[in-house]
Amino acid sequence: EDLNKATSALSYGIQKLEEQLDISVFQRQGRRSVLTPAGRLILNEGRKILESTVLLADKAKELATGWEPKIRIAAESTLDHSVFFKVLGDFLTEHEAMDIDVCESVLSGGWEALEHDRVDLLVGAPGPVPLQKGFRAVSINPSEMVPVVASHHPLARLANDPEALKEAIPMTRAVVTHDTAMVDVTRNAGFSMGKKIIYVQTMDQKIEAQLAGLGMGHIPKFRVQRYLDEGRLVVLNLETPANENFIAWKISNKGKALQALAQKLGEETW
């Protein structure tokens, strides 16, 4: 009844399938017919094929109407990812067939990835916006960056003495997240660097390195608020350079999905 087919029609269909594949799909157990292992495999894999077919049809329909099937996004390491993924979740609820590919970028790396078409959308990229690259950029509220060290780091004793800090910083090791640029000139942000640096790959590594007392560095405050409250990290009384963050994409990219997602991200309160 659920299939809206007569029993005879189902039996005939199963018989034809068994003849074509030269296998048994059902076997008798008493008065009941049950699936053979081969039949169970066909059932399970058939469901996947049907789901894939539906998804393919949805993607083809969106593509035919100007909606690209995939968006590649570079999210800056200082970005509040909880806000980002909330917006992304709302977007995917409206566009379930869309594929999303997210990577993390640092400093110049995101702009370079956008310029060289490795990503379609840049979220949270630090300014300034590169000129004459054909980018459309929308400013968003930047993450508050705080200069911190571990409470047991030597600089912690000077945390409230700006003059002493200025003298000590050039001799203190900095913890720096690698710029992800592969072609363009990389850059650093935050402290004026001395000669001693420890480079890490991710913001998580940077936080752990600073908690371990390996050096100093700027970190988004929302990422370390718990450690500040616990007294494991100490904020240094230094002027923090003003920063500006952007959502950016190429002006030449007219994809409807990109435009819709960029608008949602731009309207969000970061």
Q: Where would I find each of the regions flagged by the language model?
A:
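A short LG(V/I)-centered, amphipathic sequence patch enriched
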Residues: E18-L35
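Alpha-helical linker/hinge and terminal dimerization helices associated
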Residues: Q20-L21, I42-A64, P126, L261, ...
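Periplasmic-binding protein-like
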Residues: E239-K254
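C-terminal regulatory
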Residues: S108, G134-L214, I219-N243, Q263, ...
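DNA major-groove recognition helices of helix-turn-helix
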Residues: K16-E18, F91
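Hydrophobic residues within well-ordered alpha-helices
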Residues: G39, A113-E115, E208-G213
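Interdomain hinge and pocket-entrance segments immediately C-terminal to HTH DNA-binding domains
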Residues: K61-D80, E94-M98, P142-S143
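Helix-turn-helix DNA-binding motif, specifically the short coil turn and the N-cap/start of the second
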Residues: N4-A9, G13
